[in-house]
């Protein structure tokens, strides 16, 4: 495909037009009085949202240079959302302000690399200040306030705080769409995975189609079990102990399955066969998690353990195992706390080193099942609002977790506006000092935009907030200047610093760009004759 190339001012201005088109659509949603944006879908009803990253994803521009500019800002929103779950609109507003001020200085003759260094030094100083100023989140009320602001609904904040209180900060909180209106919270005790019994004959409660084993042994096998002679020696030992047995394996089939079912029906021996969750390496890892949770071992040829020689010492134990046709829950495994803590640390390290969003999500689920528990928030709303509400709750959950992780600062853009005094641009020289001043100007952008959306004069509000004591700012919902932390208006530090760092990173890229190579727009082909006739033929 042919390419089109733009240089110098033309290249940067093209990128800036794309950035502005996207930022102008996103920034109207900032703050408690932010507006909504309607997104047209190819199929189905339009989506109504005030979520920055959702709006950014939908914007596709025609001009090739503008398109690249918009894509770069989408990356800012996406990275901030990935790291912190919120702050996408703040990041976009900051990026727009940094680029606007930066390009003005480049046009006036400043060296882009000097500006870049100044921006980086100023951002580093602000980040350090925010982390030092952060207040730890210790109470349920603080979590509720943080999540409530993110979701734009105090009731959602309270429900998320309740869920976090129950499952702990490592626990998984998932959000599902519900057919009924309102919000519901479901809590799962123990480790749950989405595989059930292999045969309905294992059910101990025929009406509920559920098998409940009290104080069972847990046998974990990485392969298939098909012959009864491999299983028999271990079965005899378990029967002598008088305990039921839960078998979790890749599959249980043939005569081994028939033997278990016949013994269950006759009442000789209570057991249940369950398919192991996942595939390949993920299945092996999950079986190992279960082994550590229950204090057992995974029987696998890879480590030299075979089923026919295994004794009771390789079996795990739990207070209860509940199995339905779709899922299994292991309650109160007998594994040692030290081993579980070691496994949790290992999974946490894997999460930090993973580049894949999908892998990170799956590792996070495994971590929660070992360390905390699982809470499900079921959200119901009118059809056109349902997806948007679910997305808002998911963002609020991640926001609350970010607050617990690094603490909170005053919200409403005030912590950024008041951070302009923490670095001394006079200590820098030339273009580096100019770069630091660009950051100082841009730090006011979020509070100014919140003021605009609330129908207030942005310059006056920014000036007043900047000169107020630390933590004091504008409550845009009421129009009152007050102690924002005391009023429950706060932002997680992780969200605020991620927004600034990602915005500065993309702004530096804009300023140091000297050429843009883009695909040349294709000319539309000649229209096809709808009658199917031959072109150019006249009859």
From Swiss-Prot:
Summary of the function given for this chain in its UniProt record: Together with its co-chaperonin GroES, plays an essential role in assisting protein folding. The GroEL-GroES system forms a nano-cage that allows encapsulation of the non-native substrate proteins and provides a physical environment optimized to promote and accelerate protein folding.
Assembly description: Forms a cylinder of 14 subunits composed of two heptameric rings stacked back-to-back. Interacts with the co-chaperonin GroES.
Keyword line: ATP-binding, Chaperone, Cytoplasm, Isomerase, Nucleotide-binding
Organism superkingdom: Bacteria
Stored SUPFAM superfamilies: GroEL apical domain-like, GroEL equatorial domain-like, GroEL-intermediate domain like
Any single GO CC term annotated in Swiss-Prot or TrEMBL for this entry: cytoplasm
One GO term of the biological process aspect: protein refolding
EC number: 5.6.1.7
Subcellular compartments: Cytoplasm
Similarity comment: family membership: Belongs to the chaperonin (HSP60) family.
GO molecular function: ATP binding; ATP-dependent protein folding chaperone; isomerase activity; unfolded protein binding
Residues that bind ATP: 29-32, 86-90, 412, 475-477, 491
Protein name: Chaperonin GroEL
Gene3D superfamilies listed in its UniProt record: GroEL (3.50.7.10), GroEL-like equatorial domain (1.10.560.10), TCP-1-like chaperonin intermediate domain (3.30.260.10)
Claim: Isomerase is one of the keywords in the record: yes
Phosphoprotein keyword on record: no
